[in-house]
Amino acid sequence: MDDTRSPDAGDPVVTDPDKYHVVLENDRVRVLEYRDDPGARTRPHRHPDSVMCTLSTFDRRLHFEGGTRDVHLETGHVGWLPAQVHAGENTGTSPTHVLFVELKDSTSTPSTSPDAAPA
């Protein structure tokens, strides 16, 4: 997934409109809902600093410029997601369902490190 190096990695609502959609947006935040099924993959995209809330238990492989990272997250996990560029794939047997609360006033430079995966 070398495309994660691209500075043009886009808005996930544009790169994967079948998986991401905006549920709330104002001048301070944008809330995205993400859903996919086992085996689904996303194109490289970027997130600003965000809070991630998992609404299902799932397994994912995240592809960053610096490598990959496998994550297992349980329903109800709430964590900080630093600004980053990545692509992902559902490596489990259950659908993924997540809310991202993206901060609009974030000035952080997106990370391309596997260590930037959800905390």
Range-by-range predicted roles:
Residues R46-R61:
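Short, conserved beta-strand element in jelly-roll/cupin
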Residues E65-A83:
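Short acidic-glycine-tyrosine-enriched beta hairpin
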Residues T57, A83-S106:
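Ligand-binding loop in jelly-roll beta-barrel domains
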